[in-house]
Amino acid sequence: MSNWDTKFLKKGYTFDDVLLIPAESHVLPNEVDLKTKLADNLTLNIPIITAAMDTVTGSKMAIAIARAGGLGVIHKNMSITEQAEEVRKVKRSENGVIIDPFFLTPEHKVSEAEELMQRYRISGVPIVETLANRKLVGIITNRDMRFISNYNAPISEHMTSEHLVTAAVGTDLETAERILHEHRIEKLPLVDNSGRLSGLITIKDIEKVIEFPHAAKDEFGRLLVAAAVGVTSDTFERAEALFEAGADAIVIDTAHGHSAGVLRKIAEIRAHFPNRTLIAGNIATAEGARALYDAGVDVVKVGIGPGSICTTRVVAGVGVPQVTAIYDAAAVAREYGKTIIADGGIKYSGDIVKALAAGGNAVMLGSMFAGTDEAPGETEIYQGRKFKTYRGMGSIAAMKKGSSDRYFQGSVNEANKLVPEGIEGRVAYKGAASDIVFQMLGGIRSGMGYVGAGDIQELHENAQFVEMSGAGLIESHPHDVQITNEAPNYSVH
């Protein structure tokens, strides 16, 4: 039988329990480097990841956060085909060079070209002699189709085939931009020595490179994206489809990552995908992190029950206050030379700084993005104000939609037999995700400047915390005043 001292191991701290101590600094906020390397093929320019929740991250959110320099994790409350399509939308939204452009043949109907353009929001399609030889013979664009009345006509009757402007494989963006401007065209097909279509550069993608200089991209200039899978019978099929669609990582998403069945499944996934990036969680202890790394995970997700819509801690009585959980898991991550993501409990940009200072390499956010334009949640008006729906993946509605396996209830068929660990609610409408990111980054840079940390590694090494009393927390917030105009980075919860 354990004695009192071993039963109650230690005190746990969360964000409202601590503050970072300001220190001598030679770092200005605008000099701070926020780049973070999570895995060999996964380097972000900002340490922000949007949660794999069905009211937070679809393709629109993933595109927005990747353009800002972060990473979106596409939720799994949809069919395998639908989720893979969401990944493709992100990967095709922006390219340095499109290495696998869509193409049709002269025999295809104009209607097929139109359907392809509308589906993927592109303005033109290269035309090849045959699907087998891929020899470029023309291109059809929106301009070619503008006055067509017979959409059953073959593309050969309307495509541009003479005086095609092309470039060789390996042409850089600067040269491509010059060619596009010189010929007043929007698309530049890349061909090999045999005239075979091997890539495509568009003026739109070049403009996006200029507009979003800090975007998080893969080696081909495409936006980074991850996607969630569960521990179910379709795990391998789903993971295969997601990687095939271009996912840079998969997130094995469960409520309790330190579970024998989960660890066995992760080891099988690692054996099946030996060279892919695997993120898994959630855990809240050093032992949990160690078990996941031993199973083959690259990045561990930390947090059991800290989220605003999560009820695990009160329904199950289980969890570890988030700052302590991050700190303990980070110590193990350093042993393995790997990384962690702090998932949940963050309300303000200052909490992000605390999460990083405690050892996090990035943070995962749900509620802070749920109210944005890009979030999939429905918009509603309540008492004259605009809100968006937000629900935990452990809520009844989300579990019925497909997330019940996350809470080890995948075999439950009746809604009234589900035991939820989350709630459904609403959050205030916030506008564009880019505006939220701007304010977040300003707060993170400011915090790192206060403690003299030029990058996240220095923050790990040099930051020190002070425990805060309840009175200290009251003092930390605006007090003894009635707020008349809310600041863009602060609201009363």
From Swiss-Prot:
- Pfam families under this entry? CBS (PF00571), IMPDH (PF00478)
Q: State any GO BP term from the record.
A: GMP biosynthetic process
Give binding positions for NAD(+): 253, 303-305
* InterPro entries xref list: Aldolase_TIM, CBS_dom, CBS_dom_sf, IMP_DH, IMP_DH/GMP_Rdtase_CS, IMP_DH_GMPRt
Annotated K(+) binding sites: 305, 307, 310, 475-477
PROSITE patterns linked to this entry: CBS, IMP_DH_GMP_RED
Would the keyword Coiled coil turn up in this protein's UniProt record? no
**Which top EC class is named for this enzyme in its record?**
oxidoreductase
Cofactor or coenzyme needed: K(+)
State the UniProt keywords alphabetically.
CBS domain, GMP biosynthesis, Metal-binding, NAD, Oxidoreductase, Potassium, Purine biosynthesis, Repeat
Q: What is its EC number?
A: 1.1.1.205
Q: Which CDD domains match?
A: CBS_pair_IMPDH, IMPDH
Q: How is its activity regulated?
A: Mycophenolic acid (MPA) is a non-competitive inhibitor that prevents formation of the closed enzyme conformation by binding to the same site as the amobile flap. In contrast, mizoribine monophosphate (MZP) is a competitive inhibitor that induces the closed conformation. MPA is a potent inhibitor of mammalian IMPDHs but a poor inhibitor of the bacterial enzymes. MZP is a more potent inhibitor of bacterial IMPDH.
Q: Which residues bind IMP?
A: 308, 343-345, 366-367, 390-394, 421
Subunit structure comment from the entry:
Homotetramer.
This chain belongs to the protein called Inosine-5'-monophosphate dehydrogenase
The organism's lineage?
Answer: Bacteria, Bacillati, Bacillota, Bacilli, Lactobacillales
What would be the name of the gene that encodes this protein?
Answer: guaB
